[in-house]
Amino acid sequence: MNRKLFILIILFTFFIFFQISYAVDYSDVFITYKGKDLGQFTLKNSIFEKDKIIVQENDSYILSPVIKLPFCFEECVPSWNVKCSDESSFCVFVRFGKSDSENKLSPWLLMGEWGEMSNYKTLKSYLDKSQIEGKFENPFKYSGISIETDYILSKDKKFDLIQFCFIFNPNYVVEFSSLNISASTQRGDKKLKLYERTNLGKNSYVVVPFRSQGWEDKKISSEICSVVSTATVMDYYGVDIKTAELAKVAYDKRYKMYGMWWRAVQSAHQYGFDGYVRHFRSFEDVKEYIDKKMPVIACICVNKNDIADDPQYETDGHVLVILGFDENGDILCADGGFRKEEDGILSYKREEFEKIWFVNGGGIGYIIMPANKK
């Protein structure tokens, strides 16, 4: 065999092997339970009716099946759509297991609360009273796994089973519409070479009514980027809610913050919207939504020198709305951190946005849409 040809074959084989290894270095999965899928849930003092679960009595619970993920995850981001009155409340618990250990599950951890905040003793009494199998010990940590405000982190990547439990104290009827789970084998995405620049279409975007974080309540203006982004998308679909009003709904009393991911989705659901949080790994993923005229809410993190035009800008967390792609194929956004629309509707170079969203921000985004929109 010709020596040069032999070397080329070896190099080509190595290249293919490297690309395959590179591409499968992490995995993502998005799982949703809604409609008839909710018939798989175990219920107490609740009924499955017309593709929803109706909760009508106190001491009710909804228990998901034990969900088998296709891998042991590092990061899991859940969200849900539960419609309830101002007087109703519920707690969300989660536990984990490994499929090769006789499906033994961990104690329950506290994922979140809606409505009146409870102390840990009361939370434990909810589980005890419901007679759900399982313990409630440390509310936020267990054997290498922890609840990190609005997502689940498993540094050891040793769990591939997950189960959720919703315990309710409804004063009025509560409707449970969906449970959504986005899981990944890694938190950030440092493999930008996976995403070669493709033709995403130029001048392909939606137009939203701009709103600023600083237009209403100045006391919280620096804390409500998630709320403003959610309100912007709701306004785009025709529901104009004051930002300050939505902020009251989205505020988490335990963590004392407005920007929790699942709470953004849950808040919008109170006004007739469905939604979920998920991992995005490429702008091809985004294009699927833009083609349907659906804006995408993105959670970014910016280090100094990440943005060439503003090298001193940095933030450990900011939320804005992706509108689509400008005339250069770069990323067109609505950023409520600006006071004026002419400043807040802006484009990011694709490579820079890849870094601040996919790499630094882990590709976390949420979709808000009118109920029953596909």
Annotate the PLM regions:
Residues 8-17:
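Bacterial N-terminal signal peptides
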Residues 20-59:
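Glycan-recognition and processing domains
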Residues 72-84:
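A short beta-strand element within beta-rich, extracytoplasmic domains
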Residues 55-72:
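Short beta-strands within extracellular/lumenal beta-sheet-rich domains
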Residues 105-157:
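Extracellular carbohydrate recognition and processing domains
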Residues 25-40, 68-71, 87, 99-102, ...:
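Noncatalytic regulatory segments and standalone regulatory/sensor domains
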Residues 57, 64, 240-373:
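Conserved active-site-adjacent core of cysteine acyl-enzyme catalytic domains
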Residues 20-23, 30-32, 159-161, 165-257:
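Active-site-adjacent structural segments surrounding the nucleophilic cysteine of cysteine proteases
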